[in-house]
Amino acid sequence: MLCRALLQFARMFSSGSYDDVKRWLRMFLNSHAKREDPRIEAVLEDDEAREGRFYAARLRLGSQTSPLMEFEYDVVAQRRGELAWCAALAQRVREQARQLLAGSTAAHAR
């Protein structure tokens, strides 16, 4: 019974339109990046070539940005309800945020 409830819960968050998933991804990235520093913002790039297929995101702290992170729409839409996938993505985002902070600290030390 519990497994069935968990699967139903996961399906509730899976899928969605490109824009719905984009909104979820932006909120997820911001939520985890801001755990490292509330000044960090997640920015999703608008690119017609990626529209409907991919998302491109960076973390920004002032004038500094993280390397580009790309996400396939289908993967995010299907897996955003999976705890293990979300945990791995959160770890990746927080690591990018820490690297961005380390670069910011080094730049201010100069």
Give the label of every model feature segment.
Residues 39-43, 58, 70:
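Ser/Thr- (and often Asn-) enriched beta-sheet segments in non-cytosolic proteins
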Residues 23-24, 69-71, 108-109:
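Long beta-sheet-rich domains in secretory-pathway and surface-associated proteins
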Residues 2-46, 80-91:
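Negatively charged, low-complexity tracts enriched in Asp/Glu with abundant Ser/Thr
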Residues 2-7, 88-110:
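C-terminal low-complexity, charged extensions that often adopt amphipathic alpha-helices
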Residues 30-33, 60, 101-105:
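Signal for well-folded cores of large energy- and translation-related assemblies
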Residues 49-55:
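A short, glycine/Asx- and small/polar-enriched loop/turn
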Residues 47-49, 60:
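Soluble, non-transmembrane alpha-helical interaction regions
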Residues 60-91:
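Intrinsically disordered, low-complexity regulatory segments enriched in Ser/Thr/Pro
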